Amino acid sequence: MQGPLYIGFDLSTQQLKGLVVNSDLKVVYVSKFDFDADSHGFPIKKGVLTNEAEHEVFAPVALWLQALDGVLEGLRKQGMDFSQIKGISGAGQQHGSVYWGENAEKLLKELDASKTLEEQLDGAFSHPFSPNWQDSSTQKECDEFDAALGGQSELAFATGSKAHHRFTGPQIMRFQRKYPDVYKKTSRISLVSSFIASLFLGHIAPMDISDVCGMNLWNIKKGAYDEKLLQLCAGSSGVDDLKRKLGDVPEDGGIHLGPIDRYYVERYGFSPDCTIIPATGDNPATILALPLRASDAMVSLGTSTTFLMSTPSYKPDPATHFFNHPTTAGLYMFMLCYKNGGLARELVRDAVNEKLGEKPSTSWANFDKVTLETPPMGQKADSDPMKLGLFFPRPEIVPNLRSGQWRFDYNPKDGSLQPSNGGWDEPFDEARAIVESQMLSLRLRSRGLTQSPGEGIPAQPRRVYLVGGGSKNKAIAKVAGEILGGSEGVYKLEIGDNACALGAAYKAVWAMERAEGQTFEDLIGKRWHEEEFIEKIADGYQPGVFERYGQAAEGFEKMELEVLRQEGKH
């Protein structure tokens, strides 16, 4: 007899994954459905359809129904006993919206266990497509959202972010303008996360307290939809109608939404007591893939760079994102997204290899050696200026700049900043400088969100977790620790591409097994086998070095402002 099991679903752009864990957080089954490889009847590419003329990127909702049929069938083939599943949660690609038709509730309630979901729910939607996060068709709407409360800073303060093309509010606004009749016939609007929960509940599920913050509609401090923004978004159909479409949002991320629909009991043998828990967004689910304590930081070093932190401080800014924490009241999730990450580092790596001319043992060996041999900020002596630079092979959003490279010399003693005048030994000085540049930007933008981890230690993260391709690189890890700190060190987190599904499954475990008032971090922290998932790869806080990089961060901020001024952006 196996103990209780929990499923976390991850509905991303290119696949649906169902990951099953037991109470001890051990993964016991995984079933995947790759949209391009496994689906039939949809002319998709990389999971989406595009209308380039209008910059639209979207997915057919029926594809996701086919995928859920496929994932559950996959678990059945692996011999999983569905009657052991006690709780289900999920993670959905953030910001995407699903438009339900007037007969949606009826169709969800009357599912026939002898047929697939796709056969029966194809007609449940007023609009067959869901906008994808890559969609950029809403510039006009974003401009209106940014202006609605007085400016980008005001919108960010209210909703956690300035307006973004992919955010659900601007998308709904464009939808009601482009398809006014379809909008009127839309009974409910779900996020991708609450869509997953709705399928299992057999009726429309409420949105999740964290994922609702990715809409530009939820006033985070008030804990309610922002009336002015609803008014802007709703157009002539009015605020009350839009409120009905969106529904109420429960405060508790672990609330029991209700039992699984009888369709799944009859078709797969789920227990009628299996409980559905609110599904959250893919980014909030990522911080649930480990017991991330307040002030811990997670840096994803992939093609782009993403920085996630759990913090009690709410200090929004147009360049960053704040969300309610998906499980823990009083905490927020802070997020930074950069377009330039791995590619920028690889270009410097290639230049170093070319200059040296010899074939290194691994492609990163020379880059690492040069990075570690170069002193912090290229200062061989205290009297030397700090070498600071920006390296953007792609246009950047943080700060908002064109692609390009800029190099400066900064003197922390008098605060003077000069464009570099041939003092750089290119490309060797750039190896360390590019890692410093990326990490200083993270430090600059997360200051004020951390606390002191102990007597006499400056405010910084307790731990810095690195994930993604760049986390394998010891030199990057060492520089990350010197700049970001981390009183307990820098760790490599090995959860592969399962982070979102794991986070969703852990959320279900916590929601079903928590004691009264027990936090997610406490319950998961006691059961998480950290030695299986993390390895300490570098020291964090080093007295003296950390403070020196604090001076560099001031120079870095001056440099960004100077470049923005030069480019006519400030």
UniProtKB/Swiss-Prot annotation:
What does the UniProt entry say about where the protein is found?
A: Cytoplasm
| A GO BP annotation | D-xylose metabolic process
Q: What induces it?
A: By D-xylose, L-arabinose or L-arabitol.
Keyword field contains Cytoplasm: yes
Entries under Gene3D superfamilies matching the protein:
3.30.420.40
Protein residues bound to ATP: 364, 469-470, 473
Enzyme class, top EC level, equals transferase
- Report the SUPFAM superfamilies cross-referenced here: Actin-like ATPase domain
> Which EC numbers does the record give?
2.7.1.17
For this protein, the record's InterPro entries field holds: ATPase_NBD, D-XK_euk, FGGY_C, FGGY_N
Residues given in the record as substrate binding sites: 95, 166, 282-283
User: Which keywords belong to this entry?
Assistant: ATP-binding, Carbohydrate metabolism, Cytoplasm, Kinase, Nucleotide-binding, Transferase, Xylose metabolism
Q: Name one GO molecular function term.
A: ATP binding
Q: Name one GO cellular component term.
A: cytosol
Name the predominant localization.
cytoplasm
* Catalysed reactions listed for this entry: D-xylulose + ATP = D-xylulose 5-phosphate + ADP + H(+)
Give the similarity note: Belongs to the FGGY kinase family.
| Function, as annotated | Highly specific D-xylulose kinase which participates in the catabolism of xylose. Xylose is a major component of hemicelluloses such as xylan. Most fungi utilize D-xylose via three enzymatic reactions, xylose reductase (XR), xylitol dehydrogenase (XDH), and xylulokinase, to form xylulose 5-phosphate, which enters pentose phosphate pathway.
Q: What is the protein name stated in its UniProt record?
A: Probable D-xylulose kinase A
Q: Which organism does this sequence originate in?
A: Aspergillus niger (strain ATCC MYA-4892 / CBS 513.88 / FGSC A1513)
